[in-house]
Every structure is written in structure tokens, then in C-alpha cells.
Regions:
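Early extracytoplasmic/lumenal segment of secretory-pathway proteins
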Residues: 1-14
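Short, hydrophobic alpha-helical packing/hinge segments within bilobed ligand-binding/sensory domains
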Residues: 10-13, 122-123, 145
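Short, conserved clusters of charged catalytic residues that mark active-site
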Residues: 11, 47, 140
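Paired acidic/hydrophobic, glycine-rich loop segments that form the ligand-binding mouth/hinge
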Residues: 23-30, 131-138, 155-158
């Protein structure tokens, strides 16, 4: 197993595409960022995901949260009232890209991305009060966010939800009281 850092996983993906033998001895493990770069037509991409066959998928989840001085748990009403709602965006072609769509669908008109902030940098800006909304995947949510929730400094807003094989969306067991995005969408839009 070899990780090749840099380029939003494009470097490593391109290297695998160029050097891997199609004999079943190579496995291409990729993140959402790898897929988003294909979907957005990034000219640096030299790999063709349609030529690969999925063998295992790992369900991941996104947890959205804010500071307790900005909102009540699971309630976007105060966030939606703000004229400016800042959030971190690693790059325009990162996995965070779908957050723009999520915030639009939830009617957060003041949502504005701050590009160039890594997950860690964005979270530090959030803790300093420079960013209003933040999100993390499961591992960082458990390690970094849950302790802040327990201290009363941070509140859950929602999770993306876990998509079942039948297409149903269930709540994340790491935050069972937090609504899923479909639940929040229905709450906000009826």
C-alpha cells in the first residue's frame, strides 16, 4: 500500500492509472475528491474511473455543526437569518463541493465559502469564531467535534445520513439525534 500525497489525490491516481497492471493485483482506493475531480472535468485527471470495477464501498458520512452561540441543536433558523455564513472549502474540486448545493437547498442564502482551508485549518478557524459552519467525516467528528459538543461549545445541525442498499437514508449512530439531510430538507422546505 502506498499513498502519494499532493494534488487532491490526482497525483497518486494518475500514477496508478499509468503503472498498474490490469491483472487484479492492484487496488485503487479513492476518496470523494478523486471522483469530484472527474465529475468537474479537471484537466489534470488522467484516470478513467469507468474502467475500474468497484469491489468494496465504505459508507462515509458528513456531520454538519456550528457553535452553540449561533444556533440550537438541529435548528437552522438562526443560521438562515444571518446575512453572512462562512464555511471552509478546501478547493473548488474537493469533496466539499457538494456543501454549496446542500446550503442552497436548505435556503442558507448567506452561505459563502472560504476556499483554500484544509479540513484542519477550517476547523481551527471555526473554533476561533472566524467560520460559522463546519463539517467533518466520522473519524474527525468523534475525535475533535464530540468533545466540543460535550463541553457545550458546539451543536450538531445534521448529518448526510447513511444510505442503505435499498436507497433509504437512516440516521448516523454516531449522532442518533441529529437529523439526516433529507429530514432537514423536509423540515426546512416542507
Amino acid at each position: 500500500i502506498r499513498h502519494i500525497p499532493g494534488g487532491g489525490a490526482i497525483k497518486g491516481s494518475n500514477k496508478l492509472e499509468k503503472n498498474a497492471k490490469a491483472d487484479g493485483t492492484f487496488i485503487f482506493g479513492c476518496s470523494t475528491s478523486v471522483i469530484v475531480n472527474v465529475a468537474t472535468g479537471n484537466p489534470l485527471v488522467k484516470y478513467n474511473l469507468s474502467e475500474y470495477r468497484p469491489v468494496v464501498l465504505l459508507p462515509q458520512n458528513t456531520h454538519w455543526f456550528t457553535r452553540s452561540d449561533l444556533a440550537e441543536p438541529h435548528d437552522l433558523s438562526k443560521i438562515k437569518e444571518r446575512k453572512l455564513v462562512l464555511y471552509a472549502l478546501k478547493t473548488p474540486a474537493s469533496a466539499d463541493l457538494f456543501h454549496i448545493w446542500i446550503y442552497e437547498k436548505l435556503g442558507i442564502k448567506g452561505a459563502k465559502p472560504i476556499p483554500g482551508l484544509s479540513s484542519s485549518g477550517g476547523y481551527q478557524a471555526f473554533l476561533r469564531g472566524e467560520i460559522h459552519l463546519s463539517s467533518h467525516g466520522a473519524a474527525n467528528y468523534v475525535k475533535k467535534v464530540k468533545p466540543e459538543i460535550e463541553k457545550g461549545k458546539v451543536v450538531d445541525l445534521m448529518t448526510l445520513g447513511i444510505i442503505g442498499a435499498d436507497g433509504s437514508v437512516s440516521r448516523n449512530p454516531l449522532a442518533p439525534n441529529a437529523p439526516t439531510f433529507p429530514e432537514m430538507y423536509e423540515k426546512v422546505n416542507g
